[in-house]
């Protein structure tokens, strides 16, 4: 094989191996010299009969010996060719050959495919037959002793039927599933395998079956087997992109085709089978799990089913690529891989008759378990649905039905096969009745034999196990081999067409969802080196803006998907395409987006959730049909090789010993395909070398990319070949390092997103994390904690490893607590205020928090309880502390975990707890906001100012607590008590407290400093400042007040009634306006006109910003209206400016007094006699103003004058009437009597400016909290 750039070295294969269809041919089986070696790594069960045990297999031969850039991995190939080692059979057993494929993912992420045909050969070695006989004698002796060992035994399903005294039964037992060297013929498994660079599964399967047929056929093959193997290794090239290729097997030609550069990448695994095995509903659910990078475990007795589903799912991910551990067939010796605390997609072979419940998996909290054989899946909790899932499945169903495949799957079952046969026969009978089919059966066949219907029928019948003889068609049908061959080819064509059409539907969903993704890619780096260096610190995708641009139903899925590694890699590839050749998948995807824009013009911001079907199905199917109908390339025919005479002698049933010298290297003569491919290869090599000189060193690039991603590529794909303890230990150490790094990244992300620094630094202005994004990040943290607690677990006791650990800790602590009779609590016992009213300290207890969760009947699973406990601990800022306490019980940790487990690596564990501790810097409400229906106990304390007021009053006090989720209703406070506890449905974040009394008795005046309310589960304590009197004839005469809450810090040991470490977020209305208790507070400094105007502008601006945020980001509107710097307080400052002092009037005068005088003026003055120009403007607004003021005055509430003004402002804001009322009041004659001449309300320019500012909130729909306007009927 000339035309290569360098002469091939001995035993190395030829240079242009990258252009060859197949790289290696491999033979695996029993080594006669080694004899029978039990496969200990496969977890051998010696209770089984020897024929059911597995033994070590070996690679007997492989050709060529090695390829320089793709070294032969002997251990991995042997392990995957025979994942359970050698198996033995006798003449009585089924010995049908079995085909399966496998994949080897190298550390750099590149893949090699293997295609294996396993068949059985007669054992000719007497040594092995004797060894098997000996094993059976030993096994039968053990069985004999076990049968007679007990008088009341029922040993197992077989032995239980044996009569203890019946020797004949024992003989039957020994004969069942046994081996007798004199009576039985022993067979052993052997595998032939092709290793290829691309997954041409159908072509390799046909070639291997022809090779096997040549071995088992009575007639020897036309040429020695070496000719066919040499041909496929060295003389069959890879078809170029967009072309088809025909090469020759032993008996028939084999056809394959490769998609073009602008088509979806090659996928030869039939999605039809995946749909039949799982059903469309399950397939889409598993696909969603893989998209969200959940741990996914496939489970089946059949290796090829595992590969078909795994490859089918990963193929559908286009344009994204699976970035983590990918082992579709997990050999029995590698079951420890399931302990990996990283996302994975793995396949596990089930043993015959094994129940799912007996399968012990290290971690199931975030596992998607797919039982392929039983058509059953188990999904993780908190699982978001794929966008437009119902319409999506409907579109996929239509495609399947066009190909005669039921969307619900299970067509492989015998029952479905029978239904199919009956359905087809019924259709034929109906056609005959209708006169569409002649009576003559031969004519029926002649009519149908060339049709698509019969081709599909025969292809389906072949798959479902319905033989053609069972259908009453003429015998001549089975004799027409050419017709069957054509039908078989047509079935393959239809499989390929179905494949591409299903994939087009999936690809179309992503094209629609991410049609505008480029608009949100952040490209800040000037060159590749600086981008790679700072990759970890940079945000590459504007997630918040992207999500705000999406339809609401898409958000639960998209918010989680854009956090995955596969999406991050996709965006990385997009940014890298500035400096280097675009990733092939990205190139195809971008071209499709361009096509959408050409045919479907739309603005990037006009997102819609209307489902848009795929429009390119016919086009995609036609391109495949055109390639298969007309061959672009035909490979050289197999031919005689220069072999030694007498070797390679044919012996039926035995695969011959191949001549290695003729298979070690390629041919010396020129080959036009190889020459052409080699030239292209050399050109590609020159371009690669050139780009290396110009651009960044590739090693440096790979280093940075590995560092930038959450786990390195070597961690994402552990090696299958080296299973030494040192390598396993090193792999585990990498897992530990990876978990620690992931924890650091997640906590940092949570902090940055919560504080909003990231968005500000990127120039997006102020940005707070949305509830949806926060929920996504916290769910991701819960998943990480579950994976950490599952790593290195010794004994699994439930689906949640974390909750299991907590339960065992709780059990030990409660036993200890009973012994010592002391509660587990941390922190001081009590907190006292200066007034002597005590707010009892909430116990800081891990066990108590667990009990809260255990009392929540809404949560049904251990995984749900663990997540709720994490959320509660995070909200209480105790997550790190609780976990530290949990892990402080070292004997328990040692009992539960292996030495290599993350939780037993002390240094890493301490760093992990430190990273979690950093989350205490921000406030989370992730428990309160999620569990909205649970009953929560609250404790309230009223703190009076004793120096100036009675602590106890004779009247009947009451309280009403309101939050974002509801209110308690009016609750009577027991007399002479300032503290009370109550239980009600979760109120959410607390916003207001209404407090009052009925003014009865002699001591009915009450000066309240503040009210404290605490959530007894989360520990959140709210302070509601008051500082005002409640009573008639004092202050503004109010018997009830509305107080606005501020959240206190949980760590402060100061007086809760006086101090607050954090700046107050909210204050009760009017507390900063003016206080009549001058002896206590002194006279506050009055703001000047400029400060007042600035305050108005700020208050209105805050309301405008509130409504410009996404709905889930908005805070409390009550605070913006009635809080310390709210609109009410700002307008009070305006109305107080220049207000004539009480010294002149000899009594306290309030703004409401001025309002009432204005109303009296409007009601008594006959405005019709006034200037008619003013009447038109004033009359409607003045009537409305009077109506609102009178409604407030007549409301059945004992609200003071300041409280009434607050209600008036709130209603005027809600109904957009303030800009009309302000000029009315400014022009009212009473203003000259009650205001100084320099007052702001008497300055026309200031009033006009105020009106313009208030008009900016006219377009917003303002909804007031019920507690603010309760009882006012307008």
UniProtKB/Swiss-Prot annotation:
Q: Which GO terms describe its biological process?
A: positive regulation of triglyceride transport
Q: Where is the dDENN domain?
A: 401-581
Residue limits of the cDENN domain? 263-399
Membrane-traversing stretches:
916-936
Using the record's annotation, list all stretches that form the RUN domain.
772-932, 1118-1267
Where the record annotates domain PLAT, the positions are 936-1044
Where the record annotates domain uDENN, the positions are 39-244
Q: How does it sit in the membrane?
A: Single-pass membrane protein
Keyword terms of this UniProt record: Acetylation, Guanine-nucleotide releasing factor, Membrane, Phosphoprotein, Repeat, Transmembrane, Transmembrane helix
What do the Gene Ontology cellular component annotations say? membrane
The record's annotation in CDD domains points to: PLAT_RAB6IP1, RUN1_DENND5B, RUN2_DENND5B
Task: Give GO MF terms, alphabetically.
Answer: guanyl-nucleotide exchange factor activity; small GTPase binding
List every position bearing N-acetylserine: 2
Q: What does this protein do?
A: Guanine nucleotide exchange factor (GEF) which may activate RAB39A and/or RAB39B. Promotes the exchange of GDP to GTP, converting inactive GDP-bound Rab proteins into their active GTP-bound form.
Q: Which family does it belong to?
A: Belongs to the RAB6IP1 family.
- What is the protein name for this chain? DENN domain-containing protein 5B
Its source organism is: Mus musculus
The gene designation is Dennd5b
């Amino acid at each position: 094989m000339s035309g290569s750039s360098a002469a091939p070295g001995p035993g190395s294969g030829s240079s242009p191996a990258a252009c060859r269809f197949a790289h290696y041919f491999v033979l695996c089986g029993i080594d006669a010299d080694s004899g029978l070696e039990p496969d200990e790594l496969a977890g051998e069960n010696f209770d089984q009969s020897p024929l059911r045990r597995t033994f070590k297999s070996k690679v007997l031969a492989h050709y060529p010996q090695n390829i320089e850039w793709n070294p032969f991995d002997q251990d991995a190939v042997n392990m995957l060719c025979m994942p359970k080692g050698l198996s033995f059979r006798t003449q009585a057993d089924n010995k049908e050959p079995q085909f399966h494929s496998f994949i080897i993912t190298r550390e750099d992420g590149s893949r090699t495919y293997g295609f294996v045909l396993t068949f059985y050969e007669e054992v000719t070695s007497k040594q092995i037959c004797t060894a098997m006989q000996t094993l059976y004698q030993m096994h039968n002796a053990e069985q004999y002793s076990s049968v007679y060992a007990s008088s009341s035994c029922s040993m197992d399903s077989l032995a239980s039927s044996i009569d203890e005294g019946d020797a004949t039964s024992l003989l039957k037992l020994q004969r069942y599933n046994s081996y007798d060297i004199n009576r039985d013929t022993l067979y052993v498994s052997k595998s032939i395998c092709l290793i290829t660079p691309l997954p041409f599964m159908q072509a390799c399967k046909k070639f291997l079956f022809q090779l096997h047929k040549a071995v088992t056929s009575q007639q020897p093959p036309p040429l020695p087997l070496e000719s066919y193997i040499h041909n496929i290794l060295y003389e069959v090239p890879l078809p170029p992109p967009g072309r088809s290729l025909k090469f020759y097997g032993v008996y028939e030609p084999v056809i394959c085709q490769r998609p073009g550069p602008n088509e979806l990448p090659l996928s030869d695994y039939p999605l039809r089978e995946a749909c039949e095995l799982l059903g469309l509903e399950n397939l889409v659910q598993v696909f969603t799990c893989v998209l969200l990078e959940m741990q996914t475990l496939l489970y089946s007795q059949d290796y090829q089913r595992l590969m078909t589903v795994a490859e089918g799912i990963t193929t559908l991910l286009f344009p994204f690529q699976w970035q983590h551990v990918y082992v579709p067939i997990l050999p029995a010796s590698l079951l420890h891989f399931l302990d990996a605390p990283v996302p994975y997609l793995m396949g596990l072979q089930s043993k015959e008759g094994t129940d799912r419940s007996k399968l012990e998996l290290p971690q199931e909290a975030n596992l998607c378990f797919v039982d392929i054989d039983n058509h059953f899946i188990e999904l993780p909790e908190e699982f978001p649905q794929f966008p437009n899932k119902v319409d999506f499945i409907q579109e996929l169903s239509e495609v399947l039905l066009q190909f005669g495949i039921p969307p619900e799957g299970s067509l492989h079952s015998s029952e479905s096969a029978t239904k199919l046969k009956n359905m087809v026969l019924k259709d034929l009978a109906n056609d005959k009745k209708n006169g569409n089919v002649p009576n003559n059966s031969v004519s029926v066949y002649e009519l149908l034999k060339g049709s698509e219907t019969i081709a599909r029928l025969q292809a389906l019948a072949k798959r479902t196990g319905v033989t053609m003889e069972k259908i009453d068609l003429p015998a001549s049908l089975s004799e027409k081999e050419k017709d069957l061959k054509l039908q078989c080819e047509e079935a393959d064509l239809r499989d390929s067409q179905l494949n591409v059409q299903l994939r087009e539907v999936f690809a179309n969903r992503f094209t629609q969802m991410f049609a505008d993704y480029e608009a949100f890619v952040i490209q800040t780096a000037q060159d590749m080196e600086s981008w790679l260096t700072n990759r970890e610190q940079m945000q590459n995708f504007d997630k918040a803006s992207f999500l705000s641009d999406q339809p609401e139903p898409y958000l639960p899925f998209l918010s989680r998907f854009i956090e995955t590694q596969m999406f991050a890699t996709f965006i990385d590839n997009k940014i890298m395409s500035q400096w280097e050749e675009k990733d092939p998948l990205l190139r195809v995807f971008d071209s499709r987006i361009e096509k959408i824009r050409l045919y479907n013009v739309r603005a990037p911001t006009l997102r819609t959730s209307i489902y848009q079907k795929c429009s390119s199905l016919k086009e995609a199917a036609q391109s495949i049909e055109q390639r298969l109908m007309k061959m672009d390339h035909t490979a050289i025919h197999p031919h005689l090789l220069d072999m030694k005479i007498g070797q390679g002698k044919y012996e039926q049933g035995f695969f011959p010993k191949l001549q290695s010298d003729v298979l070690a290297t390629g041919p010396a003569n020129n080959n036009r395909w190889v020459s052409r491919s080699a030239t292209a290869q050399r050109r590609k090599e020159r371009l690669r070398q050139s780009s290396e000189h110009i651009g960044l060193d590739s090693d440096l690039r790979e280093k940075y990319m590995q560092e930038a991603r959450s786990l390195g590529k070597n961690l994402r794909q552990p090696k299958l070949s080296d299973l030494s303890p040192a390598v396993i230990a090193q792999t585990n150490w990498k897992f530990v390092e990876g978990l620690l790094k992931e924890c650091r990244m997640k906590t940092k992300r949570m902090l940055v997103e919560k504080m909003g620094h990231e968005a500000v630094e990127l120039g997006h202005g102020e940005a707070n994390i949305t509830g949806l994004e926060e929920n996504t990040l916290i769910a991701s943290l819960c998943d990480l904690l579950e994976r950490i607690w599952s790593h290195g677990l010794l004994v699994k006791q439930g689906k949640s490893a974390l909750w299991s650990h907590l339960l065992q800790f709780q059990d030990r602590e409660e036993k200890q607590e009973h012994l010592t009779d002391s509660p587990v609590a941390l922190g001081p016992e009590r907190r006292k205020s200066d007034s002597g009213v005590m707010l009892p300290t909430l116990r800081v207890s891990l066990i108590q928090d667990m009990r809260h969760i255990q009392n929540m009947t809404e949560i049904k699973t251990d995984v749900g309880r663990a997540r709720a406990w994490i959320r509660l601990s995070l909200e209480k800022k105790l997550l790190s502390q609780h976990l530290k306490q949990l892990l402080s019980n070292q004997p328990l940790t040692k009992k539960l975990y292996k030495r290599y487990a993350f939780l037993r690596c002390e240094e890493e564990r301490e760093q992990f707890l430190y990273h979690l501790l950093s989350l205490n810097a921000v406030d989370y409400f992730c428990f309160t906001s999620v569990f909205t229906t649970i009953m929560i106990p609250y404790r309230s304390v009223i703190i009076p100012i004793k120096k100036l007021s009675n602590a106890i009053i004779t009247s009947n006090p009451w309280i009403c607590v309101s939050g974002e989720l509801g209110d308690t209703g009016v609750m009577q406070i027991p007399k002479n008590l300032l503290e009370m506890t109550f239980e009600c449905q979760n109120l959410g974040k607390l916003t207001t407290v209404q407090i009052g009394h009925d003014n009865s008795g002699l001591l009915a005046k009450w000066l309240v400093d503040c009210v404290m309310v605490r959530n007894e589960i989360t520990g959140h304590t709210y302070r509601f400042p008051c500082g005002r009197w409640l009573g008639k004839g004092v202050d503004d005469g109010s018997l009830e007040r509305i107080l606005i809450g501020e959240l206190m810090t949980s760590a402060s040991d100061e007086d809760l009634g006086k101090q607050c470490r954090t700046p107050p977020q909210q204050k009760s209305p009017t507390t900063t306006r003016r206080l009549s208790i001058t002896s206590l507070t002194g006279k506050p400094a009055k703001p000047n006109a400029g400060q007042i105007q600035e305050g108005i502008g700020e208050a209105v601006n805050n309301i405008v910003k509130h409504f410009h945020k996404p709905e889930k980001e908005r805070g409390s509107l009550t605070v913006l209206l009635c809080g310390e710097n709210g609109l009410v307080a700002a307008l009070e400052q305006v109305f107080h400016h220049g207000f004539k002092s009480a010294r002149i009037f000899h009594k306290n005068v309030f703004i409401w007094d001025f309002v009432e005088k204005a109303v009296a003026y409007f009601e008594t003055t006959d405005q019709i006699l006034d200037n008619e120009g003013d009447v038109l403007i004033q009359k409607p607004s003045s009537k409305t103003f009077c109506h609102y003021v009178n409604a407030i005055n007549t409301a059945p509430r004992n609200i003071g004058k300041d409280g009434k003004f607050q209600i008036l402002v709130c209603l005027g804001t809600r109904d957009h009437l303030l800009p009309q009322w302000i000029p009315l009041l400014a022009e009212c004659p009473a203003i000259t009597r009650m205001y100084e001449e320099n007052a702001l309300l008497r300055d026309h320019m200031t009033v006009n400016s105020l009106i313009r500012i208030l008009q900016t909130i006219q377009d917003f729909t303002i909804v007031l909290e019920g507690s603010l306007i309760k009882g006012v009927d307008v």
